[in-house]
A protein has these predicted regions:
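C-terminal beta-strand-rich structural cap/linker in extracellular carbohydrate-active enzymes
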Residues: 634-662
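Noncatalytic carbohydrate-binding groove/subsite architecture in carbohydrate-active enzymes
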Residues: 135-136, 199, 204-218, 222-235, ...
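Cellulosome-associated attachment modules in secreted, modular CAZymes
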Residues: 661-722
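Active-site groove signature of glycoside hydrolases
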Residues: 143-199, 205-212, 391-394, 438-450
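Extended beta-strand solenoid/passenger and fiber regions
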Residues: 187, 191-338
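Aromatic/acidic polysaccharide-binding cleft in carbohydrate-active enzymes
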Residues: 443-573
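Catalytic domains of carbohydrate-active enzymes, especially glycoside hydrolases
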Residues: 60-84, 103-107, 111
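Carbohydrate-binding surface patches
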Residues: 562-611, 649-655
Length: 722
């Protein structure tokens, strides 16, 4: 079909006059092939992260529910990112201040979204994970009664998509999981003690197969909630006044259980109260040696307890009963050896609990394990994932923004899809075919224009740049999935509602005024999902003429560690359509990624529909601040065409009511009128278009040679004739 469209455009261009060519160059013309078909957009592609550390006041209010409902979410990722690796959903049910699992179930139900759950890989067992699947999905009366007791709902929640942990190949996850990752990671001990190198091949193997590990020493802080204390791999506790009275204390280590036997634990009891003010000042003055100094202070020889002074108990906790009495606020560090099941065992237990669920792994096994680790391929055949998890955050947007390369930021989405996602999926398909396992899809469960963290973030990211990028990411993923370019199982924007303006969120909550404010990202998402959120047309069912080309710059890195800035051409407009055949409305979405020019748009109604008198137009635009605006207007029907101007860096939607035509499109495929449609008809028609005079190009005889004529041309050989 795409070849046909290109040929039609070429033939049309040959026959058109110079005046018409000038008109086409100034206006982008869009039409649809008659008798087009709709493609359903999966709910799982319309996802948003709404994390469990959200204050309940942010989400439990009518304004937020209305805003959330307006974007038509398909899934809500819960409980979150890094901290989800050790999230205790049962304990958090007692926390009425935050969005716990009970409140999340109610919130998802109120906006008609499914929950996409991130399992606490860092602390769970296969049995616990399977129990949660049963609790949320099993219709058995036993689980129905438990749901009623815990969540005030008896029907199954129906959680289909499950992630086994979050970013566990990363070095910033060691404080939330029994094992994490990082390239060239060293675990450090006391000064002058040789550090332990933990290569990715080792940590990835532990992640999948499980095994024994010592939680001992410390790892460098790497952000995402790590500090000088939790970056120590052991568990630190302070003795209480009651512990002092009792002369002993019991500690349940964070990533236990401890393997039985005192040889599997090392306990340090600091012999004096630590001056935390002095420690803080030392870290401010000497940050590069701060962690080492703190560990040396705690794990000093005089603080080491004799194995007779503690007992590893049957449940994997430890009882400490030192001969030197405990005192209040005494710092205790327990280092320990523990055993954990890996992703394979957890996945298998969950699949037994509910074979219909889809489970994703968060570490790409092809990098260090496939065809390399003993037994890995065989085990992967037994325990394959349904999808691999990807978090496509950008790392060069500030550079582009500082130099005014704004269109380039928008086209990062193209680069992700065509240069990363499609090749990655093609590689996965090859692996799956070789192993004879079902195809593995992709899950893009966190993404945004920029992840700013707690630091300053350019205000433009909260304005139209963030909105337009969000619109590009959602819509391009929808279209890639519809056109069978990608198998996307999940796509979740990061994130939902939060306070402050440094992180990039859909909505901001003002704690002073207790109000909810939309952002350009939430408005863009609403507009996209109103038009193509549930169904859309395939790319080949649109006829697009004169999509303006932008000359863009990109940095290319070469194998010899050199780089260069090169130029390339890209279409300025992203164009998507849907046909609401229930309400008889044609929908058009235009993303103008051009950072310097507005562009004129003309949309022609297919010949099998009669357009309404006017159509509804909405435009989201803004400048390089956090300020943005939406403007609504109506566009008049002129000969079944609708025209408007899309401002630079804008999101536009056009909703056109129509009446199905009582007469079908003209059928002239039997061009030579010999009673049959044959190749000769096509050749005769091409000859007609290629002549130098008397060309029949105005096929609908309306006095103009427009896209509608090409549509009739298309019905001759590409469309259906009744």
């Amino acid at each position: 079909m795409k070849r046909t469209l290109n040929l039609l455009y070429l033939v049309f261009a040959i026959c058109a006059s110079n005046d018409l060519l000038a008109q086409v160059l100034n206006t982008t013309e869009i039409s649809l092939i008659p008798h087009h078909t709709q493609h359903d957009v999966p709910n799982a592609l319309r996802g948003v992260n709404q994390t469990a550390n959200s204050n309940i006041n942010w989400t439990d209010n009518t304004a937020f529910i209305d805003e959330f409902t307006a974007i038509n979410p398909g899934t809500m990722r819960f409980p979150g990112g890094t901290f989800a690796n050790s999230y205790d959903w049962e304990l958090e049910l007692n926390n009425s201040n935050n969005l716990n699992l009970k409140e999340a179930i109610a919130l998802a139900d109120s906006v008609d979204a499914e929950i996409n759950y991130v399992i606490n890989y860092g602390t769970t067992t296969p049995e616990e994970a399977a129990d949660l699947v049963h609790l949320l999905n099993d219709p058995d009366p036993i689980y129905a009664a438990q749901r009623q007791l815990l969540f005030d709902v008896s029907d199954p929640i129906g959680v289909k998509h499950w992630e086994l942990g979050n970013e566990l190949a990363a070095k910033w996850e060691w404080h939330v999981s029994w094992v994490a990752g990082g390239y060239n990671l060293n675990i450090y001990y006391q000064t002058n003690v040789t550090p332990l190198n933990m290569p990715r091949a080792m940590t990835d193997n532990l992640h999948y197969f499980g095994g024994d590990i010592w939680r001992k020493g410390w790892v460098p802080m790497a952000g995402d909630g790590m500090n000088q204390i939790n970056s120590m791999l052991g568990t630190i506790k302070k003795a209480t006044a009651q512990d002092e009275i009792d002369g002993e204390m019991n500690i349940d280590v964070e990533f236990g259980p401890i393997l039985l036997g005192v040889e599997n634990a090392i306990v340090w009891a600091v012999d004096a109260v630590i001056d935390e003010t002095a420690i803080a000042q030392d870290c401010e003055d000497y940050p590069e040696i701060c962690q080492q100094n703190i560990y040396d202070l705690i794990a000093a020889p005089q603080n080491l307890l004799d194995p007779s002074e503690y007992t590893v108990q049957a449940d994997g906790t430890i009882s400490i009963h030192p001969t030197t009495p405990l005192f209040e606020d005494q710092t205790i560090l327990v280092e320990y050896k523990t055993h954990h099941a890996g992703a394979f065992d957890i996945r298998d237990a969950m699949k037994i609990a509910d074979p219909t669920i889809e489970i994703g792994y968060c570490i790409d096994f092809r990098t260090h394990l496939l065809d390399t680790a003993p037994g890995f391929n065989t085990r992967l055949q037994i325990s394959p994932p349904d999808f691999l998890i990807e978090h496509p955050y950008n790392d060069s947007t500030d550079l582009f923004l500082n130099y005014g390369y704004l269109s380039e930021i928008m086209h990062m989405v193209d680069e992700y899809i065509y240069e990363k996602f499609i090749p990655k999926e093609a590689g996965l398909d090859i692996t799956c075919a070789a192993l004879e396992i079902p195809e593995i899809g992709l899950a893009l469960t966190e993404w945004n224009i920029r992840l700013c963290g707690p630091g300053d973030c350019h205000q433009a990211y909260n304005g139209i740049l963030g909105g337009l990028y969000t619109a590009n990411f959602f819509s391009q993923c929808y279209q890639a999935e519809a056109d069978d370019l990608l198998d996307i199982r999940l796509s979740n924007h990061f994130a939902g509602i939060a306070t402050g303006f440094n992180l990039i969120h859909m909505w901001h909550y003002n704690t002073t005024t207790q109000t909810v404010s939309p952002t350009a990202q939430s408005e863009a998402t609403r507009m996209v999902n109103e038009v193509i959120g549930e169904y859309m047309l395939h790319s080949e069912e649109m006829v697009i003429e004169n999509n303006p080309m932008s000359t863009l710059d990109r940095q290319v890195n070469y194998p010899d560690d050199t780089s260069a800035i090169i130029q390339y051409e890209a279409e300025a407009l992203k164009i998507y359509t849907s046909d609401d055949t229930i309400n008889n409305v044609l929908n058009l979405l235009i993303l103008n990624n051009d950072d310097s020019l507005a562009h004129n748009i003309q949309f022609a109604i297919p010949c099998d529909r009669i357009g309404g008198v006017d159509a509804d137009l909405e435009i989201l635009s803004g400048d390089l601040t956090e300020l943005f605006s939406t403007e609504a207007s109506t566009i008049q029907n002129v000969s079944d065409t609708y025209s408007f101007t899309a401002p630079m860096l804008s999101v536009s939607t056009l909703k056109i009511p129509y009446t199905p035509s009582s007469t079908s499109c003209a059928c002239m495929a039997d061009y030579n009128e010999n009673g049959s449609v044959e190749t000769v008809d096509f050749l005769d028609l091409l000859s007609e278009y290629g002549c130098t005079s008397n060309c029949i190009t105005d096929l609908n005889a309306d006095g103009n040679i427009l896209v509608s004529d090409i549509l009739i041309f298309l019905t001759f050989f590409g469309g259906l004739c009744p």
